[in-house]
Amino acid sequence: MEPSATPGAQMGVPPGSREPSPVPPDYEDEFLRYLWRDYLYPKQYEWVLIAAYVAVFVVALVGNTLVCLAVWRNHHMRTVTNYFIVNLSLADVLVTAICLPASLLVDITESWLFGHALCKVIPYLQAVSVSVAVLTLSFIALDRWYAICHPLLFKSTARRARGSILGIWAVSLAIMVPQAAVMECSSVLPELANRTRLFSVCDERWADDLYPKIYHSCFFIVTYLAPLGLMAMAYFQIFRKLWGRQIPGTTSALVRNWKRPSDQLGDLEQGLSGEPQPRARAFLAEVKQMRARRKTAKMLMVVLLVFALCYLPISVLNVLKRVFGMFRQASDREAVYACFTFSHWLVYANSAANPIIYNFLSGKFREQFKAAFSCCLPGLGPCGSLKAPSPRSSASHKSLSLQSRCSISKISEHVVLTSVTTVLP
């Protein structure tokens, strides 16, 4: 992991402290106990870090598991966008369950305790999860861009989404093989290597100093800078399309005010009083679709923004360290250590933030989360069902929804019919 300032290189008995007896038989054991007591045991602020990691671990695992269950058990939620959201949740579960505990131990002890094999596997899975997350967010942005800005150019289907997800994992597993190839485990204190794994480090080993500069420059561009730039342009066009233009066939006053319940009745009466009911229903359906697309776009923009903010510190620090060679002789070691440690925590916090975003910005996910928690926590109310509603109840709900949505159009139709009957002889 990245905060690896060579622990043990600065170790030794501090000046002014009592020197140990000259090489007693148990000198190495005493030395290890000294290091554990004065160096490895978590400090007060590190206990705060441990608590933060535990909170992220619980929220990320529970939240992303609920996201997967909600889509799996509800056929009406199996949309193209939700398929990609589930894939993002699977990547978050992977990195949380496997990589987070190892990262926490490395950040606290500054030692790699998991041996040579996992030194290659865990960083490799970490890099794969980053690639999967970036590619998934890119495919979501591309799908929304086609659906909203160019609906006639490409038809997105669930089958194509599943194929894209398989391609995302295949590409990510392939392009991150160099990350596993260069990882090696070594001991800072070779004389203690046979007795303890403390002060072992898992770091990259390159044949030439130029290779890591090229690799990490490309890694930063491919997994962060270029995708975020393209996604920002896509969402900018989506924003202009959804918020900058009116619905075709309607007046601008209606489009500006359709979200305001207090003005909706008057505007609809003014704009639709001369239209028959089918056109009014078509207009309301168009407004409903516009509202749903705006909510989805808003949620996805927030997910992308949080991802960019959470991955920005570690991306910049990696470039500074690997490309420009900084932090090798850091004068303020504690500050550098704190920066890397916090940046690691932010990466995992992003995995916990996504389900929270879905809960606040998606009514369907919020309903499923509430149903799941009501089953586990009786105090929250009656236990709901995570399964999709029956056809009869769904039809009844749809009928009630249509009735509420069309109540205003019925008022307009009543005004039209009244005026017609008064004019007729």
UniProtKB/Swiss-Prot annotation:
Cytoplasmic face of the membrane: 68-82, 141-160, 236-298, 361-425
Gene Ontology CC annotation, any one: synapse
GO biological process, one term: cellular response to hormone stimulus
Topology with respect to the bilayer: Multi-pass membrane protein
Sites carrying sugar chains: N194
Region (Required for response to orexin-A): 26-41
Stretches of the chain found on the membrane's Extracellular side: 1-46, 106-119, 183-213, 322-336
Record carries keyword Lyase: no
Notes concerning its domains: The N-terminal region is required for orexin signaling.
Purpose of the protein: Moderately selective excitatory receptor for orexin-A and, with a lower affinity, for orexin-B neuropeptide. Triggers an increase in cytoplasmic Ca(2+) levels in response to orexin-A binding.
Misc remark: The antagonists suvorexant and SB-674042 bind at the cognate neuropeptide binding site that is situated between the transmembrane helices and accessible from the extracellular side of the membrane.
Identification of the protein by name: Orexin/Hypocretin receptor type 1
Organism phylogeny: Eukaryota, Metazoa, Chordata, Craniata, Vertebrata
